[in-house]
Amino acid sequence: MSKRVSAFGAEGDDEPQEKPMKPFISFSSNINNNNNSNNNNNNNNNNNNNNNNNNNKNNIGTGINLNIKNNNNINNNNNKSGFPVKKSRFNGEDDDDDYFFSNVPPKSSMTTLNKSPPNFENASSNNNNNNNNNNQESDSKNQNEDEDDEIDPLDAFMENVNAQAAIDNSKSIEKGQQQQQSLKSKRDDIDNEDDEEIFYKLRQKQLANKSSKQQQDDDVDYSSLDDDDGYFDDEESLKNGQSKGKRIIEPLPPIDHSKEEYIEFNKIFYEEHPDIANLTEEQVFEIRKNLDIRMTGTDLINPVTSFGHYGFDDILLQAIAKQSIETPTPIQKQAIPIALSGRDLIAIAKTGSGKTATFIWPSISHIMDQPYLEKGDGPIALFLAPTRELAHQIYLETLKYSKYFKLKTTVLYGGVSKQQQCKELKAGCEIIVATPGRLIDMIKLKATKLNRVSYLVLDEADKMFDFGFGPQVLSIVNHVRPDRQTLLFSATFKPNVEEFARTILSDPIKISIGMIGSANSDITQIVQVLKSDSDKWNWLTNQLALLLSQGSVLIFVSTKVAVEQLSSNLTKFGFQTCTLHGDKNQIERSQTIQTFKEGKINILIATDVAARGLDIPLIKNVVNYDTSRDIESHTHRIGRTGRAGNTGVAYTLITPKDIHFSVDLIKNLESASQFVPPELIDVAMNNPHFKRERGGGGGGSNRGRGRGGGGVGYRRNSRGGGVAFNSNRDSSRSDSQNKFIPAQSVEGGRLFNPNNTDNSEINNENEKSINNENKFSNNNSGSSNDRNSINYRNNSFNNNSNNTNNSGNSNFNNSNSNNGYSNNNYNNNYKNNSNYNNSNNNNNSYYNNNNSNNNNNSNYNNSSNNNNNNNNNYRNGNNNNNYNNNNYYNNNNSNNNSSNNNNSNNNSSNNNFNNNFNNNNNNNDNSNFNRALPFNDFNNNNNNSNNNNFNYNNNFNNSYNANNSNHYKNNNNSNNFNQRSQYNRR
């Protein structure tokens, strides 16, 4: 049944009709009548009979509901109008008629209608008649009167209705348009006054006020720089019309692990190699000491010395070889066995030491042992990083190895479309690298979950807590299954952060490589003390061309304004630069880094936003145009060069105003055996505390008074004189409690070499047969004492040291001539070792003798004239020092000559070593000896023949000539170790 359409729109229409329909008149059968009992021709279905009333209500179908009362008495016996009464125009659609006519507004009287002439244009006929009541007796018949042709009230009413309908229609259309406009403006108002947006704006304003009090345009505050997804995404900021500001990240709600179902997994994949298992405690101790490793914890695991000891799959070993990695770094030698053993770990190592690969390689073994992901599962390995740059760097490093095992890896950080990241997560991935805030967003959006995570890594964990991500990180960790494996890595680790980290770890092993927060010894630090800031510009413009000839240059400044200003000045000076700071969005940052990495532009000027996570091998020089806020940031700045065993140079420009930073910088230089310019010490002397520690009086007491030469150091002892550094600390104490034990330096000496002094102490413990003079001369390879070692490396800065250094070489030659051997301590020890034929004693002798050298591993390289490893030789003062030909150290020629004469008197140290080695190998099981050597990677086979030993020494002298494939394969063949087969995932 179709519905009628009214002039104003039928029920259910969305919009009113613009034109009214033509009115019609219908005598519907659905009429409510109040009739007399004498009504004979009333066919209505709904009749209400009243004995006292004789009123007939007429229904008029006009397209509008009407209810008109007629006060006249109407006799319905005869209808003379000519229109049918019982049959409606719509064939008796009573329900529709009743619906439309039920809401007709009542009219008081027909006399109130307009008396104007009727308009019959839209009327089908005139169906209203005025009847007269004859008031006759009750038994007489009712008679109908003729129509009143003068004025028809119905016509007048219809005309008024049509006019009113047109007016109402126009008003309705106008009102609809106003409502639409009102709704549109109202939605805009809601968007502008969104509660969440108001909260964010208020919070942003509060943070801005707080930040303005603490810092004026200082980029060093990471919480305002890194946009590390604790911030609005760029797309969200533009959408809401907001400037970039810190966003409040609510931690994840707690989770009840007892209600979760977790699959079983294995996290122990390490089987100790026989060569490592056979090492004695003394040998393990010496290996750790040589690698400068300190460990605390229970059930400590021995370090390895080669890749073959890990038990990695051949595919992973080949992937490592393709990266031109020849030997593990110190942290990799100790931390990877711990990670493969399923233990929780706290690892502290200097920047550029290979921390990233340390947790990536074990993660692949961990993942490949587990079942495949099912639909809806989250990742198996989760790597958290504080900044987007570091997260992206870890992601790229992970791809280098995961692609060979078809493991899907995804990175999550702010500034990237959430929609795309959700799509990648829902497709499934085994490894996620993420910043805490964006990961929380993805979990709340149900794009991923942490039900499968069993391998959790927090890189730069201390900075995550420093940035205020502690609650967020803790909530993420609490969403991971309790029996997970957790590893924390950082270049620095403050005691309060360490205490917090231990709450999320289970029986961890803590290892630290070198001094906590120390600089990388592969990086040469050169400090330039200038009179004023204006001198910095002159120095930079004079040196920049030379620095660019060596490779790309990274320049650090302290503020965003300074970045743009320095870039503009260098551009005017003819240099092409690119910039990186906190105001750059993610797209601009990525483009800048990519341009710099490809070498299209060789100068990058940046704030500390680039101090972490930027790994570009082309960077050969770092210039600290402005000093960093603290020494930790300085360590990360200079760590952008000299990465993964490569060498680099870092220049730091100091002015007299940098008093407090100079104090920390001196300690940093000393910890890495770097030269400390006297001018830098003069600046630091303006610090009262530093002056009390190292000031001029020398020292009979802790107050710096008494006789003896004034010196610099960490503490003074009761013997007076200068002081030296001793890093042999009790590992049972915390790092904050460890103190530096001074040692006596030469009379009047002001500088010292911490590493050499430390080695001399080791020699006192392990080699009583060699006097102190010999120990110093052997360690320094051409110096008679500690002071001369520093002068040998840096006498271009202090000409007065040359004479002393030459005298040191003279003493060195006399010492060696008495012994009849060259400058290799192990030659003397092999000569004097009566128990050489005993393999166990031989191992002990090897390590004890090796301690007398400045750097055990580099001694092998330095002893080899074929290595030409100039950078390492420079570190250890070898005769083949590349820097001897440089202007920096051109005064060392006399030292080298004396060393060369010494070598000629001894008929070549290497040949002496080989002869002694072969002569003492009669009837000896040399396989045990070779297993103890850290370079047994290069042994082809372990035989008992003297010929093989001679070949070993040849390989030893030319160790780096072996290619990578032989490096790994030969090691596996020599040990006959049962390697695990290819990974078979369940």
From Swiss-Prot:
Residues 522-684 form the Helicase C-terminal domain. Residues 336-511 form the Helicase ATP-binding domain. It comes from the Eukaryota. It comes from Dictyostelium discoideum. SMART domains: DEXDc, HELICc. InterPro entries: DEAD/DEAH_box_helicase_dom (IPR011545), Helicase_ATP-bd (IPR014001), Helicase_C-like (IPR001650), P-loop_NTPase (IPR027417), RNA-helicase_DEAD-box_CS (IPR000629), RNA_helicase_DEAD_Q_motif (IPR014014). It catalyses: ATP + H2O = ADP + phosphate + H(+). A motif (Q motif) lies at residues 305-333. The Q motif is unique to and characteristic of the DEAD box family of RNA helicases and controls ATP binding and hydrolysis. The gene is ddx42. It is found in: Nucleus. Keywords: ATP-binding, Helicase, Hydrolase, Nucleotide-binding, Nucleus, RNA-binding. The keyword RNA-binding applies. Its main location: nucleus. Belongs to the DEAD box helicase family. DDX42 subfamily. A motif (DEAD box) lies at residues 459-462. The keyword Nucleus applies. Residues 217-236 have a biased composition (Acidic residues). This is Probable ATP-dependent RNA helicase ddx42. probable ATP-dependent RNA helicase which may bind to partially double-stranded RNAs (dsRNAs) in order to unwind RNA secondary structures.
